[in-house]
Every structure is written in C-alpha cells, then in structure tokens.
Amino acid sequence: MANAQATEEEIEIVEEGTTAPQVTEPPLPATIAGLAALLEIPLDDCLVPCNFCGKFLSHLEACEFDDKRLSLIWKGHLVYACCRWCCTATATFEFNEFYEHTVTGREIEFVTGKSVFDIDVRCQNCMRYLDSIEKLDICGRRLPFHKVRDSWKGICRLCKHFYNDW
C-alpha cells in the first residue's frame, strides 16, 4: 500500500508575497453529446434530467435537444436539459408572455434589414431552428413570423405536419 502522506519535496511551497498558480477547469460542455464525450460514455448512457419536470431525457429527447441547438443548464456541477414536453410548454409560455409583433412572409426582410437566410428563426412550438427551406416556405405562403422576446419564431416542418398545416 502506497504512503498517502506527501513529503516536503512533493509539496510546492509558495513564498510569502506570491500567489499560487491558478488552476483552471476546462469549460463545461453545452451539449449532451459533448457531455457524453467528456465523460467518455456512449450517448445512450448519458442520463440528464429535465430542468423543469425532473424526469430524465430519453435517448431520442437527448438527440432532439442537441439538434435544436439548446444549451445545457449548469447549476454548480449539476447538469440539466429540457425534455420535449417542457420545450413545448416553455415555447408556449414565452409566446404568450413575451409576444411583440407579427410580420407576414417576406416582410421579415424589410423589418430586419437582413436576408431571410441570415435571420435565426426558431419554431414557436418545439424550439427547433428553422432551416432555409422552412423559412422560404413561410415566405412563399405568406405565413406569419412572430417576434417573441427579441427573437423570431415561425413553424417548422415537423410541427406543420403534426398540426396538418400544409
């Protein structure tokens, strides 16, 4: 059994008036895939609780969380994510509480002064980022874009299909 006590040679003595070197921790991962890589475990084995309801995300929900480009929530050294149901509830709450205004179709380009391709738009229902095709579809059909909490919202193809709005 190894001696657990350190000898004087093993202890770095800091002279009076100087400071000990700062130990910097690596940055905490923002994605579930990044967390699994840091822990060197398969993504299937990475169990992360929902910040709102406390249930552990399923493998599919973990993949959706990363696909939506949401960030992990760190409280001390405890990590939380957001399950599918709570993402929808959060999106609905934000829409109802922080709605600012609505533009139709290509009006979003005139209001923002940017091309629709350069505007970040999340789904107002599930919080996914809309891709270029989804944004062009909204513009072409003259459907609404909503400004909510300083961000733009629309409806993604998955939610359109779910709500039969196509």
Swiss-Prot record:
Q: Name one GO biological process term.
A: symbiont-mediated perturbation of host ubiquitin-like protein modification
Q: Does the keyword DNA-binding apply?
A: yes
Molecular functions per Gene Ontology? DNA binding; zinc ion binding
* Pfam families (alphabetical): E6 (PF00518)
Can you list the GO cellular component terms from the UniProt entry? host cell cytoplasm; host cell nucleus
Q: Where are the zinc fingers (unnamed)?
A: 50-86, 123-159
Q: What does this protein do?
A: Plays a major role in the induction and maintenance of cellular transformation. E6 associates with host UBE3A/E6-AP ubiquitin-protein ligase and modulates its activity. Protects host keratinocytes from apoptosis by mediating the degradation of host BAK1. May also inhibit host immune response.
Q: How does it assemble?
A: Forms homodimers. Interacts with ubiquitin-protein ligase UBE3A/E6-AP; this interaction stimulates UBE3A ubiquitin activity. Interacts with host BAK1.
Name of the molecule in the record:
Protein E6
The record lists the organism as Human papillomavirus 19
Gene of this entry = E6
